[in-house]
Structure formats: C-alpha cells, structure tokens
Amino acid sequence: MSRILIVYHSQTGNTEKMALAVADGARRIEQTEVILKRAQDATLEDLLESEGLAIGTPENFGYMSGMIKDFFDRTFYPAQDKVFKKPYVVFISAGNDGTGAQRAIERIALGYKFKMVYHPLISKGKLTEDDLEKCRELGSTLAAGCQLGIY
C-alpha cells in the first residue's frame, strides 16, 4: 500500500478540478491511498506519512499561491532530513505561463531534497478536458512509481 498526498490551493476552482483529476488518476493504481488536502489543512504528519507528493497551485502574480507557500513554511524545518528524495509532481493553473510558480516550487523542493519524477503540468487559460486527462495521467504515474518502488 502506498500513500499519495495531494496538497493544493484553489481560488477559482480550476486548481481544485486539477487536484481531483490527479486524485482520480492515483486511485486507478491498486493499493494506493490518496490523501487530498487543501494547503491550509495539510500537516507535517501528512507529508511525513506519504510515499509521494503532488503539489497544485494557481499562478498568483507570477508565483505560487500564498497558501502553498504557507504549507512549505510550516513543514520545511520539521521535515528537513526526513523526506529525502520523496517523489513529487507539480500541477499549476496559470493565467500567464506558470513558469514563475514552477521555478519557486522547484527551488523550495531542492531544499527539502524532494525528487521531481514528472515534468510540471501547467494549464494555461481555460481548463480543458485534455488538461484534466493529463492530470489523471500525472496522478497515475506518481502512484504507480511509488507502488513499484521505482522512485
């Protein structure tokens, strides 16, 4: 049994739809438990007890959302040296190009020593069914890799 933590923040509902699709994809892999939490509700224990992490954020002013940053702020020092090479993926709902949010998350993930296992998924503009299918694939890929122990 592997546990996948999906931490997200959503203002307009787009990132939440993406998070639900990531969760749906992860649940397609047998013996996978999915923990889906808004960033403000996610805890250090959630992070430490997961085998894989998916982080979802809207792009706000070219950066990640403040609630995702808050999650990182609350968990960084207590989790340091306890999450070495934890596999993670990122999904971003962007009005612009999303790269500012992506870079910010990647810099913080380096400090945690997380291991990115799939390229960031950035949905630009209006969310499409194709975007949601890519989110499901993202969730399945993360869950399958964790389940098989290849990350």
Give residue ranges: language-model regions:
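N-terminal beta1-alpha1 ligand-phosphate binding loop
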Residues: 2-26
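Residues at alpha-helix caps and immediate loop-helix transition turns in enzyme cores, especially N-
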Residues: 18, 67, 101, 131-134
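Glycine-rich phosphate/pyrophosphate-binding loop and the adjoining helix
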Residues: 29, 43, 115-151
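A short beta-strand-loop structural module common to alpha/beta enzyme folds
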Residues: 31-41
